Design a protein with these regions (language model features):
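Carbohydrate-active catalytic/glycan-binding domains of CAZyme proteins
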Residues: 36-347
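Bacterial N-terminal signal peptides that target proteins for export
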Residues: 6-23
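Residue-level recognition of alpha-helix boundary/capping or hinge positions
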Residues: 3-11, 36-39
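Bacterial N-terminal signal peptides
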Residues: 23-34
Length: 347
């Protein structure tokens, strides 16, 4: 199987590189032992960490213009000209909407930032002034009037001078969800709502959240990947001219799932094409959002799959696929970071 060969070859190339480095290191060590009469004890030199991993002083919602990359959730980043634009979920734990209203701070919409160097970020504002009414109506109609309090997981896709901003609205913990799309002639807006791309309810296998769109460079076809632990991740073809599904009410086909969807989380597909290898890499997020959230990757010869992991296993099966690329971490003298997933790919 052709797809099984690539990771093994990559592993062997890395193995040879490590062996060569170790041989070189061994020669250096031998030379050092010959030239020294007695070993010198290593004494570490303490040095302060130049990176301050604490933004407590800026964490209040009224300081949003100073946040930089802090409080960025579910990011999507596109380079347009010489500027990087980043769109993200606006989420605050234990959010206080009364406080937000008193301080005149929008809450629950799509945050927009821009940068020239990926280091210094300017806060542009919020993409929409409100949650689109059709999304609220759909979610409320399927969830007994609950949900639809935030806009999640935006994704930007340029097309012939037009910018399409995909987003989703849902009821947390349910698959009553709505993926919508808005257009603008500027990456900073203003945006015109174009309607629903995919929507799901209690009777559907999938969950219409976390959209990610890619164009096949050979065929020009557009594919949207989306979904979550409700039924897994799906891929559906879009019409490049409209940005909507090629076939009305098409939900696409399954590309990834896990055994126990109530316990084993899976969501947030992000996909990229690597032209030198001719492969599509699908980055996904596994496990619970608040704790062991982690990023994993699979690959395919086609944007619509099938996608396989390092060992060539199709990620539609119920295997606990690897490798894990990022996971929660904690350094010494620091409380640590949890929920380090739903990655964004820099284009």
């Amino acid at each position: 199987m052709k797809q099984q060969f690539f990771p093994q070859r990559l592993f062997m190339d890395m193995k040879r590189l490590i062996i060569n480095r170790l041989v070189g290191l061994g020669l250096l060590v031998v030379g050092a032992l010959v030239s020294c009469n007695a070993p010198t004890a290593f004494v570490p030199v303490p040095s302060p960490n130049p990176w301050v991993d604490d933004y407590t002083a800026l964490s209040s919602m009224e300081n949003y213009k100073q946040w930089g990359t802090y409080n960025v959730h579910d990011p999507a980043c596109k380079k347009i000209g010489d500027t990087y634009y980043m769109y993200s979920t606006d989420a605050i734990f234990a959010e206080n909407r009364k406080e937000a209203e008193e301080k005149n701070v929008p809450l629950g919409f799509i945050q927009v930032r821009k940068s020239k160097d990926l280091v210094h970020w300017d806060f542009v504002g919020w993409a929409f002034p409100e949650i689109p009414a059709p999304a609220i109506e759909w979610v409320h109609s399927q969830a007994e009037g609950k949900g639809a309090t935030n806009i999640w997981a935006p994704f930007l896709m340029p097309y012939q001078g037009i910018y399409r901003l995909y987003y989703c609205v849902s009821a947390f913990g349910r698959n009553t969800s709505y993926i919508g799309m808005a257009e603008s002639d500027s990456p900073e807006g203003p945006w015109i709502q174009k309607g629903c791309v995919v929507k799901t309810g209690e009777g559907d296998a999938m969950n219409a959240i976390d959209p990610s769109v890619i164009e096949d460079p050979e065929t020009g076809k557009w594919w949207m990947h989306y979904g979550s632990y409700f039924g897994g991740l799906y891929c559906v073809e879009l019409n490049p001219e409209t940005g909507m599904t090629m076939q009305p009410e098409d939900h696409g086909h399954l590309i990834a799932r896990r055994a126990n969807y109530r316990k084993d989380n899976l969501e947030a597909p992000e996909i990229m094409y690597q032209p030198e290898l001719g492969k599509y890499y699908l980055f996904t997020s596994y496990d619970p959002l608040m704790t062991t959230y982690n990023v994993r990757v699979a690959y395919s010869d086609s944007p619509e799959g099938p996608f396989v992991d390092f060992y060539g296993e199709d990620i539609k099966d119920t295997t606990n696929n690897v490798p894990i690329l990022t996971a929660p971490y904690r350094f010494e003298n620091h409380p640590g970071w949890a929920g380090t997933a739903h990655c964004g790919l820099i284009d």
